[in-house]
Amino acid sequence: IDSMDETSRLAVAAGLTALKDAGLPLVPRYRLTTTGKRVTVGWSLPETLAAETGVIFASAFAGQDALIEEVTASAQEDYKFNHRLLLRMLGIANSRFAEIIGARGPNTKINSACASTTTAIAMAQDWITLGRCKRVVILGADNASGSTLFEWIGSGFLATGAASTEARVEDAALPFDKRRDGMIIGMGAVALVVEAPGLAEARGIEPIAEVLGTRFVNSALHPTRLDVDHIASEVDALLDRARRAIEEL
């Protein structure tokens, strides 16, 4: 835990909750002592699930709070270097989560800004379709409004005109609404288990959703500007793919 930044801790906690909700078991993990005694050293996925389970960590600001905290602390007279800094700066919740649960499938971290978790879902579907694994645990987390990062990230979003300036939450929280004047900066975590068809049902679990189609592309434009015509055409292409998937069911 000490070697993870705050965002990674949030992501790992969400991931463990998702495993429970998906009915994926964690069984005792053992090792032999020098005397030949078997002792429990943790909990992990059964061997039959380990190699077929991948992990994707989706985050925009993971690890940045650790760096700012360390730089701030270095100004103090009694400063001592934190030997865990590198691991905390990397923000590799995907690797740490896989280590904790023993997931040996494909593993990566992605940053697509506000679309990170959405992109991760598309990547998970691709992995499963290509046969790289049978399931993917997606971890999505950020702590942009924490005491360490908020003054920097908040100022950055305000400078680009991307953050809402409304004083009341009711006036600011208007997703997909013409009255929306920007995003609300916050913190949180989510985790999803995306699986090949039939696996959840085989465990007696009713899936909460089905992925009919995904698409992720880039408009090759400045990151704070939108090519609305290109976005509209890509949404149409995604909907066409989803309609075909529905017809095939």
Where do the model's predicted regions map?
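Condensing-enzyme catalytic core mediating Claisen C-C bond formation in acyl metabolism
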Residues: 168-249
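Phosphate/pyrophosphate-binding betaalpha-module
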Residues: 140-179
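Short acidic, glycine/serine/threonine-rich loops at helix termini
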Residues: 66-70, 121, 147-154, 205, ...
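Solvent-exposed alpha-helices and their adjacent loops that cap or buttress functional pockets
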Residues: 43-50, 101-103, 128-131, 167-169, ...
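Conserved active-site "lid/cap" helical segment
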Residues: 1-53, 234-249
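Active-site-proximal gating segment of KS-fold condensing enzymes and close homologs
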Residues: 7, 54-108, 149-165
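Beta-strand segments within the central parallel beta-sheet cores of soluble alpha/beta enzyme folds
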Residues: 29-35, 46-50, 54, 107-112, ...
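Active-site-proximal alpha-helical scaffold in enzymes
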Residues: 11-23, 90-93, 108-142, 183-205
